[in-house]
């Protein structure tokens, strides 16, 4: 049972905003309001989901005293400007990944959240899917022994259209911020501490964004991970997490619901299933509301920070910046 109903607003009306509206409806809630750069699109979205308020100007959402939580679902490069306004006005914020362009922006946002005593979090599905919490319990039991190696794949086939946002430098496109953030978040979930030694290879699209990336990471505990990313070569979204006494295979890991655990000694397998892929946004909403209520905070902003530090370091080593970082 939901103890308190919070007023959620969405900033943006794209695919994720639709998922959010549907997730709230599934929980017996409704979006309170919608803000969009184009009023007509906001009105169309509001009509579709029975939302009572559409703002004439996008900034009105930050000043509305009835709004408790804002979900930011706009392109990466717009996040920090909206985060500044939302947090400064005392709004709790759940922000679509990647939460910012770089670590400097994220540190600023965290400082603002702490100053204004509000919850800031990245909408990273991996941190909220039930399968991950069950796997964490298994790992913590010691049954699999110490972690040795993680292998991550995420290959997405995007049409080779350089006007597409995935290939647009002006819209903060590229493999790392769009899909790599999932792989790195999964790695951080299982690693006992953040990686400190990071090497990589990258190839760029004609627009200058990272199209293919290979990453090797190790941490002080000698846990190792490899990542293979592509925006123009399909790969299965599969994670293999290898321990001393067995390994975990996670399928469709960004919103995973099934894992196979194989034990090295005798080869026997356990199949673990938890949660449902289609309920990913419901799990995020539930955890965010728990954090806002002050009961428990399972938003893992510390993991988000570690992942952002990795992505920032990688892009610095590649000499790859976005226009906002050059001002």
Positions of PLM-derived features:
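C-terminal helix-rich "cap/oligomerization" subdomain common to oxidoreductases
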Residues: 1-2, 60, 69-71, 220, ...
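N-terminal Rossmann-like dinucleotide-binding module
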Residues: 1-49, 327
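Beta-loop-alpha module in the N-terminal Rossmann-like domain of NAD(P)-dependent dehydrogenases
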Residues: 20, 38, 52-112
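Hydrophobic residues in well-ordered beta-strands that form the structural core
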Residues: 55, 95, 120-122, 250
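Rossmann-fold dehydrogenase core element
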Residues: 108-125, 146-148
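Predominantly a Rossmann-like dinucleotide-binding segment in NAD(P)-dependent oxidoreductases
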Residues: 127-198
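Contiguous beta-strand/loop segments that form the cofactor/metal-binding neighborhood of enzyme cores
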Residues: 185-256, 285-291, 295
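Active-site loop of classical SDR/Rossmann-like NAD(P)-dependent oxidoreductases
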Residues: 273-286, 299
């Amino acid at each position: 049972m939901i103890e308190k109903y919070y007023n959620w607003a969405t900033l943006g009306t794209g695919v994720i905003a639709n998922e959010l509206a549907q997730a709230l409806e599934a929980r017996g809630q409704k979006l309170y309001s919608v803000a969009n750069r184009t009023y007509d699109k906001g009105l169309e979205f509001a009509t579709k989901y029975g939302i009572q308020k559409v703002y004439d100007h996008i900034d009105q959402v930050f000043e509305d005293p009835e709004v408790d939580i804002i979900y930011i679902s706009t392109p990466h490069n717009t996040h920090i400007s909206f985060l500044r306004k939302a947090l400064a006005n005392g709004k709790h914020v759940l922000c679509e990944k990647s939460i910012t362009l770089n670590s400097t922006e994220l540190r600023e946002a965290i400082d603002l959240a702490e100053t204004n005593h509000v919850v800031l979090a990245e909408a990273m599905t991996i941190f909220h899917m039930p399968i991950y919490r069950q796997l964490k319990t298994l790992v913590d039991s010691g049954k699999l022994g110490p972690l040795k190696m993680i292998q991550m794949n995420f290959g997405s086939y995007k049409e080779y259209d350089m006007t597409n946002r995935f290939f647009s430098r002006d819209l903060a496109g590229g493999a790392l911020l769009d899909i790599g953030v999932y792989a790195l978040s999964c790695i951080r979930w299982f690693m006992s501490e953040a990686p400190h030694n990071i090497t990589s290879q990258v190839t760029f699209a004609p627009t200058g964004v990272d199209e293919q990336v290979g990453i090797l990471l190790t941490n002080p505990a000698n846990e190792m991970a490899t990542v293979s990313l592509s925006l123009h070569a399909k790969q299965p979204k599969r994670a293999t997490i290898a321990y001393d006494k067995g390994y975990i295979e996670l399928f469709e890991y960004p919103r995973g619901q099934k894992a196979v655990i194989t034990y090295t000694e005798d080869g026997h397998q356990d199949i673990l299933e938890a949660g449902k892929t289609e309920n990913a946004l419901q799990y995020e909403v539930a955890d965010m509301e728990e954090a806002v209520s002050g009961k428990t905070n399972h938003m893992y902003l510390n993991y988000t920070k570690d992942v952002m530090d990795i992505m920032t370091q990688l892009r610095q080593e590649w000499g790859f910046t976005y226009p906002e970082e050059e001002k």
